[in-house]
Amino acid sequence: MLSKELIEKNVDFVLQMPTLFEKIEHFLLAGNVTEAVITLQNIASFKTYFSSIFKRAKFDIPYDGDDLVVIANMLGIDTFRAIVLSYFIFLKSPKIYKVFNFKIVDLIELNAKILSDWLKILNSFKEKNYNYLSLAPYSIACIIVCENLFSKFPSCMSDVISYSDVSYNKILQKKHGFSFWDIFLKAMNMNKQSLSKIDKEMLCFFEILLSYESSRPEFYDFGVDKILDINVYPEMQTIIFIKKALQK
């Protein structure tokens, strides 16, 4: 049975970062990307993951080699940090998915697309608020938490959700007062009651992006659109802004 305690336990499990991440964070905060890469480059699973994200995200950098130090420095601190963060979250992923219709490699594909498109949107603003780039990897955390919570239920539940306007988020909200958006807020150290104007704006843009990505033909069958209640009705100006950003 689901309980508030079980929900919080799963959220804490997925968001908990190892001491290795703290070490890397120390280097990145000091602006030392090279040392951060050196700390990770002998970890085979990270090299494979990083390569997979880099190839799929198609970051616009003029380099075709495979030197991690060169790539990371060209990507910049914020983008490299987002990839590292997503890697440690990805390590918490179950190997087999029951709630969502994808394999673990599809999670990497989705992660790469959300990250690269979110970066394009952030790059389109005059003021570059790259601290919000972390929203992208935390979207993967939501998928993992949702899978962990609902995978133990009968498959017929997934069928009901698939053919109705009910979302996993709505179930948790009504039963336990929990929203998957709380994961983003907790991870980003945001307080729902005291969000700044820029916080609200960035969360709104990111919500629109998640709606867009989950409805893409290549991702729609995954079922991730059933995690959150996407209740944004953007102005035409906002839609045009996002469309132009994603075309770059």
For the regions a protein language model found, what residue spans apply to each?
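Terminal helices and disordered tails flanking the catalytic cores of nucleotide-processing hydrolases
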Residues: 1-8, 194, 224-248
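Conserved alpha-helical "signature site"
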Residues: 1-137, 144-154, 158-222
